[in-house]
Amino acid sequence: DLARTPQNYGRFKTSRGSLLLAHGRDPYFDGWSDTIQLNYGNPELQQAMIGELLRIASQCDGVRCDMAMLVLPEVFERTWGIRSEHFWPKATAAVRKVSPDFVFMAEVYWDLEWTLQQQGFDYCYDKRLYDRLREGHARPVRDHLRAGLDYQSKLARFLENHDEPRAAATFTEEVHRAAAVITYLSPGLRFFHQGQLEGRLKRISPHLVRAPIEPVNDRLRRFYDRLLATLRHEVVRRGEWRQLDCVPAWSGNGSFENFVASEWRGSQGERLLSCINFSSNTGQCFIRFGDDAFRQQKWQLMD
């Protein structure tokens, strides 16, 4: 393996002399040169890493675990040819025994989000929603949001992070606003990245730890102020969410396919409706609420 992929290894000076060590990597790409791979097939290593998590839990409220799925036994064996026992169920249980409210968030891909949720993670990256919003079509977004709430409520929703380009550089301003409403009015953890609310354009490497001065996009800043105010409403914080079906406004009008609609419903009857035309064209639709709450009453819609 060393002769075939020398870029995945490095020689390091240690107290035990010069050692040839493998860089951490996933099965599909070269190793990360700023990392060293640990052998999770070694039970003593797993116990040592649980000890590290316990130490961290005594100092903060939670951790984001980078590429957390690489530790899963089936992924680890596919990458390194080494069998291992499950690590995350033991690790999350050990930490919660001491710090019950400690939060685990996983960076995870390859449709393994549910697997890690079942192994103790409170939240998992929702890269699937992000990718579908970038593609710019409403139907795949709706399909993704049809998943069960036991799964969706444990997803971390985002429009940018340190691995992705800036949202303001990725989307037009109109699409940015629409994607933000879809993302952050969905259930789950709402993840905002430093500089996102100000419309920063330049992606910054976390290794650089500094950034150029950029002007604030006042229009986006005001938009996010309004969005954050909406997210503070009790109906969003403690209510129940559901996706709503959109149907044609009249026969032959296919523009209903471009809409994404949902609502939050509170315990006192309050309702917050979200309806987004996720396209560049004018469209029309009817929304099915699936109950009789609107019949024989007058309602005033407030934007």
Question: Language model features by range: what are they?
Answer:
Residues 1-303:
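Active-site and adjacent substrate-binding regions of carbohydrate-active enzymes
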